Amino acid sequence: NMAVNEAFIDSATVRENVVSLARNIGYVPRSRRAAIAKINFTVDVSSLAARYVTLNAGIVALGNIQNGSYTFSIPEKITVSPGSNGIASFENIEIFEGNYLTKEFIVNTGQLDAKYILPNTNIDTTTIRVSVTDGDTGTVEVYNAYENIFQVNSESRLFLVQEVNDEKYQILFGDGVLGKKPPNGSTIKVSYIVTNGTDGNGASNFNFAGNLAYPRRSGDTIVDTPVTQNVSLLTVPQPSENGDNIEPVDNVKYLAPRVYASQYRAVTANDYTSLVPSVYPNIDSVTAYGGEELDPPQFGKVFITVKPKTGELLSDTAKSAIKAGLKQYTVAGIQQEFVDLKFLYVEYDSTVSYNPGFITNKEDLSSR
């Protein structure tokens, strides 16, 4: 009976089986998500005559939360040109809670069933970056995450991510017809951030620990030279938030068939109810309805109400993030508007009837 139960998404209980069944209908369960904070800082390079300053990928800051200190990183480098005063300003830099790691694979086309599986769990798949270095020419090509079939041809440098056993992730590439196939002997470099999920939420005090560099001429070559001084204190316009754990099995079983029914197109209100939780993790419940249901009707609009897991109302930043995530699914002519929740608090008085023969002291009622 158990074997039969595990063959259907409604009755399966083992995560690997549920994920595999969801994959058959095109649903990729959400990975663990890193808490994201925004920081500002400046670097004075007036004495270095630097044309630009680069904040390299990897650790950027250490954030303090009540339950300890956490590492915050960025998945790719950020380059800023200094102003006329020689000061480079890094503003609203998004930093992700977690450790930045890399893994390399050598392509061997003679191996029929080659698999590129990342060895770590707790990866935030949105931070995965992939590049391929040609073994003959040394040319480096950046591969981007697959979004939809319309962008794919034989030269499309794209990769797919799918969850495999033990909550690890496999990187998939094209076959030379649908997506470019990495050439034999090339080196695949995958970088990603391993995160603590919800534990990283709430950091608002950061100490800089990043790696800054600027280009300096040395003979006939340009070398990256570290910048170790004149870095300002960090300011934090947004504390870390929206960290979440991997999508639970029950959620996968609920959302997978509904997202499949929407065909990844946000057209009806039910489509939005299914797609919003898949693009934004910090959601307890969501309701959507079309403007045609209002009096007077507001055609061409869909209204979305979200109850977040933390707090009572969505922030403007969260609303913008959801809209950005939905953009790839929406159709032209439909506007999304968020409606804040209204809470109804009820206070009540009660009258209790009891038999004095069983309870001699009415004060004892409070323990019954």
Predicted segments with their positions:
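Extended assembly-interface regions of large multimeric machines
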Residues: 1-124
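Solvent-exposed coil/turn segments that connect beta secondary-structure elements
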Residues: 44, 77, 193, 307-309, ...
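Short, well-structured beta-strand/strand-turn elements
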Residues: 63-73, 136-142, 274-294
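A generic structural motif
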Residues: 68, 76, 87, 169-173, ...
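Acidic, glycine-rich low-complexity/disordered segments
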Residues: 80-138, 170, 180-266, 331-368
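Extracellular/luminal ectodomains and secreted, surface-exposed scaffolds of diverse proteins
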Residues: 127-174, 178-181
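Carbohydrate-recognition loop of C-type lectin domains
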Residues: 263-368
